[in-house]
């Protein structure tokens, strides 16, 4: 048997005429009314003691009219099924344990803070990620608009490169409320007194996104192991005893190489090797090709002037 549980004039309203159910409702009304007068509302799920078959499944208009409007007006809410938390301090998969009621969707009252002290945009950072709005805002209430419904998706990681998750939030706020910076007193970051949030996972799972999995590797990872290169492109590449990472090739300075080459030719000349008629023409031909590669294309002058053959 499916029942609907929501707050209106009485605490419970169900579409059923069974006298035992009616008596149960009256009993619960008396208990909760007494607790309301004593200020001892239940704080945990188990204290609700709802019978099997009851479901908290209010419409958008019921959420705004019977819950959000009353909370913002500091009026009592007879059925304590919506917890009051700072929702933006937590990841969405942490919220179900903080809810007072719910199996596949959970409801919360929360404040919103400004993103900037002098602005009216809300700060959407939450836990290890952030909430991102999707779609258009939906007005709630007819003929007069009472509230605004906004849909948001949770992204794990840092904006704007977070990983999209399956966690969804429907945020309900009151309409026609001045949230401009001109009403901001004493540089207060508080944007709203209260908003009402419905949280659920569209796949019906309790999937979690850890920070390590949310951040994509974008920087080179350095290692101090002498067997590895000083720059390893992929973080998946590690050092082991069975294989090594090839180090980067070392470039030889051209001036040092030429200086060493001149020293060698001077040594050859001193011992008479360059006086060999058979060696000199062949070496002049090879050196001529080598010098041509260093020609300046604009001045057509060689960068280097080598004369290996003896002057006659």
Curated annotation (Swiss-Prot):
The keyword Transcription applies. It is found in: Nucleus. GO terms for biological process: cellular response to hypoxia; glucosinolate metabolic process; response to hypoxia. PROSITE patterns: NAC. Its main location: nucleus. GO terms for molecular function: DNA-binding transcription factor activity; transcription cis-regulatory region binding. Residues 146-208 bind DNA. Induction: By low-oxygen stress. Expressed in root cortex, root caps and sepals. Not detected in imbibed seeds. Pfam families: NAM. Keywords: DNA-binding, Nucleus, Transcription, Transcription regulation. Residues 50-202 form the NAC domain. InterPro entries: NAC-dom (IPR003441), NAC_dom_sf (IPR036093). The keyword Nucleus applies. GO terms for cellular component: chloroplast; nucleus. Disruption phenotype: No visible changes in phenotype. SUPFAM superfamilies: NAC domain. It comes from the Eukaryota. May be involved in regulation of seed germination under flooding. The NAC domain includes a DNA-binding domain and a dimerization domain. This is NAC domain-containing protein 102. It comes from Arabidopsis thaliana.
């Amino acid at each position: 048997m499916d029942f609907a549980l929501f707050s209106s004039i009485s605490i419970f309203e169900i579409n059923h005429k069974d006298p035992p159910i009616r008596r149960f409702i009256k009993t619960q009304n008396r208990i909760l009314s007494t607790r309301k007068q004593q200020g001892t509302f239940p704080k945990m799920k188990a204290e609700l003691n709802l019978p099997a078959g009851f479901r908290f499944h209010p419409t958008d208009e019921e959420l705004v009219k019977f819950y959000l409007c009353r909370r913002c007006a500091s009026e009592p809410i007879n059925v304590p099924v919506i917890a009051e938390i700072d929702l933006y301090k937590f990841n969405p998969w942490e919220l179900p344990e903080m809810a007072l009621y719910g199996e596949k969707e959970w409801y919360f009252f929360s404040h919103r803070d400004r993103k900037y002290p002098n602005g009216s945009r809300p700060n959407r950072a939450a836990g290890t990620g952030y909430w991102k709005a999707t779609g258009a805002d939906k007005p709630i209430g007819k003929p007069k608009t009472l509230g605004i419904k906004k849909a948001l998706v949770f992204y794990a990681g840092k904006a704007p490169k977070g990983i999209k998750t399956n966690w969804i939030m429907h945020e309900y706020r009151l309409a026609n409320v001045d949230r401009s910076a001109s009403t901001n007193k004493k540089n207060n970051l508080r944007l709203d007194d209260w908003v009402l949030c419905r949280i659920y996972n569209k796949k019906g799972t309790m999937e979690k996104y850890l920070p390590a999995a949310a951040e994509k590797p974008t920087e080179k990872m350095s290692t101090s192991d002498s067997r590895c290169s000083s720059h390893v492109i992929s973080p998946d590449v590690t050092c082991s005893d069975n294989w090594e990472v090839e180090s980067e090739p070392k470039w030889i300075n051209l001036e040092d190489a030429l200086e060493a080459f001149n020293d060698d030719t001077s040594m050859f000349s001193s011992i008479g090797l360059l006086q060999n008629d058979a060696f000199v023409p062949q070496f002049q031909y090879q050196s001529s090709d080598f010098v041509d590669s260093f020609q300046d294309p604009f001045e057509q002058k060689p960068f280097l002037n080598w004369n290996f053959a003896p002057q006659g």
